From Swiss-Prot:
Record keywords, A-Z: Ribonucleoprotein, Ribosomal protein, RNA-binding, rRNA-binding
GO MF annotations, alphabetized: rRNA binding; structural constituent of ribosome
Region (Disordered): 63-97
Organism: Rhizobium johnstonii (strain DSM 114642 / LMG 32736 / 3841) (Rhizobium leguminosarum bv. viciae)
Comp. bias intervals (Basic residues): 64-77
Biological-process GO terms, alphabetical: translation
InterPro entries recorded: Ribosomal_uL4, Ribosomal_uL4-like, Ribosomal_uL4_dom_sf
Family: Belongs to the universal ribosomal protein uL4 family.
Pfam families in the record: Ribosomal_L4
Gene transcribed to yield this protein: rplD
Protein name, entry field: Large ribosomal subunit protein uL4
One Gene Ontology cellular component annotation held by this UniProt entry: ribonucleoprotein complex
Cytoplasm listed as a keyword: no
Length: 206
């Protein structure tokens, strides 16, 4: 499909061809959900921990004799039913990461890109370059373009001034093409691709 290319000033800069195999799929929410769940599980720290009955600092001695008191039978005060006792089946430090086939991950990226195209939330910019590393001036450019919540994907090398100027603007993310991922595409309103990013995607999925 043919897609209009614009400059950061909002002027026309020609057209670019977008592959239907990447941007023209019918989006599947189940694929997107699987990839996002995999990304978030991989990101989760898993440092949660509760002490079990073998770890709490209490005596392990029997509370009172077994028979003759008329009370319920108990052993140690470390048991989970007592205040200060160990947690039964509590959380332990672990990795939440799980496997997801590489083909499903690649498919998820294509479906995320296609979903943005279908929602008319993609903008292609000829070059993501800023003359100076000034947040205020770049923020006014974004406001003119209507980009208040957007993910910018540049080429393999990001322009230093653009990256510095954009990193302090709320709801704006800037990534090189190597960092493109389903979660960041879905969580932002608009997807802004540079021409270099489009070419890299075409090369990656050809």
């Amino acid at each position: 499909m043919e897609f209009n290319v614009k400059t950061l000033e909002g002027k026309d800069a020609g057209k670019v061809s977008l592959s239907d195999a990447i941007f023209g799929l019918e989006p599947r929410e189940d694929i997107l959900a699987r990839v996002i769940r995999w990304q978030l599980a991989k990101k989760q720290q898993g440092t949660h921990k509760a002490k079990g009955r073998a770890e709490v600092s209490r005596t392990g001695a029997k509370m009172y004799k077994q028979k003759g008191t008329g009370r319920a039978r108990h052993h140690s005060a470390r048991a989970p039913q007592f205040r200060g006792g160990g947690k039964a089946h509590g959380p332990v430090v672990r990795s939440h990461e799980h496997d997801l086939p590489k083909k499903v991950r690649a498919l998820g990226l294509r479906h995320a890109l296609s979903a943005k195209i279908k929602a008319d939330d993609v903008i292609v910019i000829d070059n993501l370059v800023a003359a100076e590393a000034k947040t205020k001036s770049l923020a006014s450019v974004f406001e003119t373009l209507g980009l208040t919540n957007a993910l910018f994907i540049g080429g393999a090398e990001l322009d230093g001034n653009f990256k510095l100027a954009a990193q302090n603007i709320p709801n704006i993310d800037v990534l090189p093409i190597q960092g493109i991922n389903v979660y960041d595409i879905v969580r932002r309103g608009k997807l802004v691709l540079s021409k270099a990013a489009v070419e890299a995607l075409e090369e990656r999925f050809k």
